[in-house]
Every structure is written in C-alpha cells, then in structure tokens.
C-alpha cells in the first residue's frame, strides 16, 4: 500500500502535465506544461508526506529521500526553468536506492530487504541475500530505463515515468510474490522453506 501512496504525487504530476493547456504566470514564472506539473508534484509530495508524518509521526528513510529529491530537483527545475533537473530525479533516486540495498550487504547484519520485510516473513539467510540482490538489480534497471527514455524519447518520458515505472514495479512485485510463495514455510505441512 505504501508504494501506491508514494505514486499519488506522480499521478497528479501526470494529470496536470497532460491537461494543463494554458499558460499560468506566477511571480514571473510560466507554470504551464512541465512547470505546472512540477509545481503540482512538489505541492502534492509535501501534502502526501506531510499527512503521513502527521498521522504516524514517522516517515521511512526512502520517503524522506524521495521528498528531498522532489523538493531539490523540482525546485531547481522551477527556479532555472530547466526540466533537465527533474528528468534526473527518477534515475538518481533509483540508483541511490540500489546503492543503499547493495551497501546493506556490507553495513549491518542483515540485507536491506530483510530489515524491511523480516518482521513479516521468515526466510533462510541465503534467500534474503538473493532477494536483496534482485532489488538492487531492479533499482538499477529502473534508473537506466528512465534515463534511456528521458534522453531517447523526450516526448514520451512523462508517460513512461508514470506508466513505465508503475508497470515495472507491479511486474517486479508479482515476480517477488511468486518467488516468495515458493519458499515460504508452509505452516500446514510443516515443510521448511527451500534455500
């Protein structure tokens, strides 16, 4: 559910980008098209993550990082009227997540995915490592896919940012679910998970 809440600002960004046909001048800035969508992304991110923080008095590190990247790169996009800053957001965020997941093999006693999901499921250590590596690869692929689309198909990147990223995430989560289903402890049969 958390990942879908994280997509709310992105979906609003897409909607404003697609339906904002007019030029809006605000404080000397033209906020049509990508710039109106960027302003919407920033505002929606602040509202969504602000509401989550007010409700739970806590945001996950990934949410803080995503919010920070949105504020900094979105702010630079608006301040300099240059969309290149925003175009680098998805690749940078994905690559830094990949770095965090990869680094967790060397820092601490558990891979990142085990720290996130370990309270909910039990797996042998070798499977946690494999699952964590899969997340590293997923984040790297998402980052490079975003970068490729941004600079190869500049008229399509907003569509890909929403639908491509969401589609890749859903496919990966389905694949992860299938992988986990094969290895989870079966409480009824008493079988041990496969390594």
Swiss-Prot record:
Entry membrane topology: Multi-pass membrane protein
Main location: membrane
Keyword Acyltransferase in annotation: no
Positions of transmembrane segments: 34-54, 65-85, 88-108, 131-151, 160-180
Compartments in which it is found: Cell inner membrane
Pfam family, one: IspA
CC per GO annotation: plasma membrane
Keyword NAD included in the entry's annotation: no
Keywords per UniProt: Cell inner membrane, Cell membrane, Membrane, Transmembrane, Transmembrane helix
PANTHER family tied to this protein: INNER MEMBRANE-SPANNING PROTEIN YCIB, INTRACELLULAR SEPTATION PROTEIN A-RELATED
Protein role: Plays a role in cell envelope biogenesis, maintenance of cell envelope integrity and membrane homeostasis.
Family membership noted in the UniProt record: Belongs to the YciB family.
Name of the protein in its database record: Inner membrane-spanning protein YciB
């Amino acid at each position: 559910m958390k990942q879908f809440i994280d997509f709310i600002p992105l979906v609003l960004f897409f909607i404003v980008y697609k339906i904002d046909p007019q030029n809006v001048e605000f404080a000397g800035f033209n906020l049509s098209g990508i710039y109106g969508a960027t302003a919407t992304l920033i505002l929606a991110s602040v509202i969504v993550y602000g509401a989550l923080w007010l409700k739970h008095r806590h945001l996950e590190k990934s949410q803080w990082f995503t919010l920070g990247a949105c504020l900094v790169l979105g702010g630079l996009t608006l301040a300099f009227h240059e969309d290149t800053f925003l175009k680098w957001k998805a690749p940078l965020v994905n690559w830094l997540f990949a770095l965090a997941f990869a680094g967790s093999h060397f820092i601490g006693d558990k891979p990142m995915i085990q720290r996130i999901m370990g309270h909910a499921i039990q797996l042998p250590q070798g499977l946690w490592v494999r699952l964590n590596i899969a997340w590293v690869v997923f984040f790297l692929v998402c980052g490079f896919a975003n970068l490729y689309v941004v600079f190869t198909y500049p008229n399509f990147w907003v569509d890909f940012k929403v639908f491509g990223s969401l589609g890749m995430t859903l496919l990966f989560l389905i694949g992860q679910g299938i992988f986990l289903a094969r290895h989870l402890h079966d409480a009824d049969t008493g079988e041990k998970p496969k390594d």
